[in-house]
């Protein structure tokens, strides 16, 4: 296992979709409650993680997403409701642009790989927004009844997005018709959601530690329930390589590796000593995973 130790707490980590040895991570001072943020770009080898570029911000950074067009572009979302675009190939420490798209904290941001000029963001203002990065214009706005924690573009349907919320629902929206398609309702807050790239499935992670997976073609009754966390599930991600593999991270400080055909995790990794906030699969190596935590660390490891 490779580990990088920061002086700030880890919030989100993402592998580059273009460069097989590049990963980004955002860290925050004082657990993101007050203080500054850092966007760190790393290169890595089989033996070490190397800091390549670092940007410091006055506000906490809660999530990041690499561009699906330009290999050296990455976008970040802030505690003050701003979105910043960075080019980590140059020596300039200023963003290419900074736009205020939300009135409160932005918790999640994603770049569409099907329509690569679009980004999706959500936040504490209860809003979900589609922004055109070419001009900064908001194209669509959707809402929940409470804080929106997580949002995603559908991997194959360019007009479909998802969002999960403190209001105990996960909603699907059509950005062409500007209408809600479906709502999955729960008795618990839904902190995270992710689409499966190969099957018509969506996974939801709940505040009670449960993960449920739904078939988008069928009813609102879950088809799979995964039990393996003792506290809130902070993030789930399906593997980009197959339909059965999932990783999840939690406030219980564990990283769980699942085959969704089984109700319990195949492996439980407990290398973190604080809440685990971020995780990702490499797009170039099906066994390579990254995690980041409030224990100030970014970790890379091979699941084999």
Predicted features, each with a name:
Residues 4-10, 55-61, 99-106, 142-148, ...:
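WD40/WD-repeat beta-propeller blade N-cap
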Residues 26-29, 35, 77-80, 121-125, ...:
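Conserved strand-to-loop turn within each blade of WD40 beta-propeller repeats
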Residues 15-20, 65-71, 110-116, 135, ...:
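Loop/turn segments within WD40 beta-propeller blades
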Residues 277-304:
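Blade-level signature of beta-propeller repeat domains, shared across WD40, Kelch, NHL, RCC1
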Residues 34-43, 83-87, 109, 128-132, ...:
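WD40-repeat beta-propellers
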């Amino acid at each position: 296992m490779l580990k990088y130790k920061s002086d700030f707490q880890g919030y989100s980590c993402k592998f580059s979709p273009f460069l097989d040895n590049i990963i980004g991570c955002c860290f925050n001072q004082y657990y993101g409650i007050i203080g500054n943020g850092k966007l760190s770009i790393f290169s890595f080898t089989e033996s070490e993680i190397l800091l390549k570029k670092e940007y410091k911000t006055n506000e906490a950074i809660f999530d990041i997403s690499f561009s699906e067009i330009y290999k050296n572009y990455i976008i970040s979302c802030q505690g003050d409701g701003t979105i910043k675009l960075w080019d980590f190939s140059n020596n300039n420490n200023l963003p290419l642009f900074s736009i205020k798209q939300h009135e409160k904290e932005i918790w999640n941001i994603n770049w569409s790989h099907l329509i690569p000029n679009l980004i999706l963001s959500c936040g504490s203002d209860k809003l979900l927004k589609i922004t055109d990065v070419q001009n900064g214009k908001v194209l669509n706005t959707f809402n929940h009844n409470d804080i929106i924690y997580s949002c995603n573009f559908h991997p194959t349907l360019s007009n479909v997005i998802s969002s999960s919320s403190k209001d105990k629902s996960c909603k699907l929206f059509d950005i062409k018709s500007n209408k809600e398609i479906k709502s999955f309702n729960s008795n618990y807050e839904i902190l995270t959601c992710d689409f499966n790239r190969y099957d018509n499935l969506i996974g939801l992670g709940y505040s009670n530690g449960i993960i449920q997976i739904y078939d988008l073609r069928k009813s609102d009754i879950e088809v799979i329930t995964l039990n393996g966390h003792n506290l809130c599930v902070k993030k789930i991600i399906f593997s980009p390589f197959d339909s059965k593999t999932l990783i999840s991270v939690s406030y219980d400080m564990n990283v769980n590796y699942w085959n969704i055909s089984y109700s319990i995790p195949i492996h439980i990794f407990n290398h973190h000593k604080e809440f685990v906030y971020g995780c990702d699969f490499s797009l170039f190596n099906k066994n390579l995973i990254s995690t980041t935590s409030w224990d100030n660390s970014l970790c890379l490891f091979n699941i084999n």
